[in-house]
């Protein structure tokens, strides 16, 4: 699925190149967190594969808020830069929300700028907004798998600004009836059992078990956790037990993770089209 989306993006990038238009993503990484470095390398490899130019700005941990914001302003003003991605989390002492607000909305390929979030929430100029990659990827996955969303009860476990909230808004837009659950939700198991579509985005390994899932439900696992016993990467869903109950389930690794990277590339293409007046 993710590969198919990447091939579509590659084809569109090639068409732009025939018109003399290049697509360039600026990737900013602060510090030397191994997970962040791994994510950045993966994104750069994907850019190379699809014909998108990528420029990395690696800053050390002593970087100040002002220095980081000055770099973003420089990238905002550079007409050759179509997308700006600041790899999160940032080291302590740097304000992530200020950084997200500093990026021009039309270059905000993560979809975190308040203007993009506002367009998503209100539906005003929705078609011109850049959507957060993971929620966008979940919706795209459901649609391409021909899973009915309209009229279904979707339960999202997790209310983060990166996944839970925007995904709930996108599901609403697709005419699902949406329930958001979080750490203060009462009777969580009973609520989950009513879900036609259950999305786990809590960051707790194997949190969703088979007794929380309705027979035939669609289960989307957004979690990426390390199992402390086996040291393997696992999701928020106990895959082996839940797969026996669900009609459809996404694995971890795989599943949503590759879709997130594919949607980042799609967003970079979208930003390029937007800035060239092609949307």
Swiss-Prot record:
GO molecular function, one term: methenyltetrahydrofolate cyclohydrolase activity
GO biological process, one term: purine nucleotide biosynthetic process
EC number in record: 1.5.1.5, 3.5.4.9
Keyword tags: Amino-acid biosynthesis, Histidine biosynthesis, Hydrolase, Methionine biosynthesis, Multifunctional enzyme, NADP, One-carbon metabolism, Oxidoreductase, Purine biosynthesis
Binding site for NADP(+): 158-160, 183, 224
Pathway the protein takes part in: One-carbon metabolism; tetrahydrofolate interconversion
Keyword Amino-acid biosynthesis attributed: yes
Catalytic activity: (6R)-5,10-methylene-5,6,7,8-tetrahydrofolate + NADP(+) = (6R)-5,10-methenyltetrahydrofolate + NADPH; (6R)-5,10-methenyltetrahydrofolate + H2O = (6R)-10-formyltetrahydrofolate + H(+)
Presence of keyword Nucleotide-binding: no
Domain of life: Bacteria
GO CC annotation, single: cytosol
Family: Belongs to the tetrahydrofolate dehydrogenase/cyclohydrolase family.
Subunit structure: Homodimer.
NCBIfam families for the chain: PRK10792.1, PRK14186.1
Function recorded in the entry: Catalyzes the oxidation of 5,10-methylenetetrahydrofolate to 5,10-methenyltetrahydrofolate and then the hydrolysis of 5,10-methenyltetrahydrofolate to 10-formyltetrahydrofolate.
Protein name per its UniProtKB record: Bifunctional protein FolD
Organism taxonomic ancestry: Bacteria, Bacillati, Bacillota, Bacillota incertae sedis, Caldicellulosiruptorales
Gene that encodes the chain: folD
